[in-house]
């Protein structure tokens, strides 16, 4: 969706080169830009952005993205782009969907993305269904007494009506997760998107976190 796809991929390459244990996953839009998913399946704005992005990526960017998994396990945590049941496409947005997904990973916690909404689902021992909760700036989630599905949100296009970049910090020793939100220069990003002739709807939504 953004105006600097090459720089984003280069940053991921640098992070994994300097720290080989860093984990990066491929998402549905990445796969669409590689031609593995038909861009015609996306809404018109996303399709237009995807076609523009595909033309910005060099062969080295494409090869890197094509080498990434959509799901992996690292340091005792499951990581999936969308969901453990369907790592590329499924949106975890409801109690039934979240509950069903706990049967598709074996670790105590699974980190997901795709919806661009910071949230968690907890399945406690003996419970028949998961509990859903939002992750707000400064929230600390203790990863004990339940199994968890956790979405840290999006740094580039949040969709929970908070336009600040969203991320979380995982403390693997204390087994806690701290949710964070930070301001960034949205207007600068929007100007760069305008110069690239990306769809207005994608620019405007950044101001509102939708």
Description of each model-found segment:
Residues 1-62:
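Core catalytic region of metal-dependent phosphoesterases/phosphodiesterases
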Residues 22-23, 109-110, 147-149:
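Structural motif
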Residues 1-3, 29-34, 85-87, 111-123, ...:
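Active-site environment of divalent metal-dependent phosphoester hydrolases
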Residues 55-123, 210:
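His/acidic metal-ligating clusters that form di-metal
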Residues 6-9, 93-99, 133:
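Charged helix-capping and loop-helix junction motifs
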Residues 12, 27, 65, 81, ...:
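Divalent metal-coordination and catalytic microenvironments
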Residues 35-37, 90, 121-124, 190-192:
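Short, well-ordered secondary-structure micro-motifs
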Residues 125-210:
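Acidic, His/Gly-rich catalytic cores of divalent-metal-dependent hydrolytic chemistry
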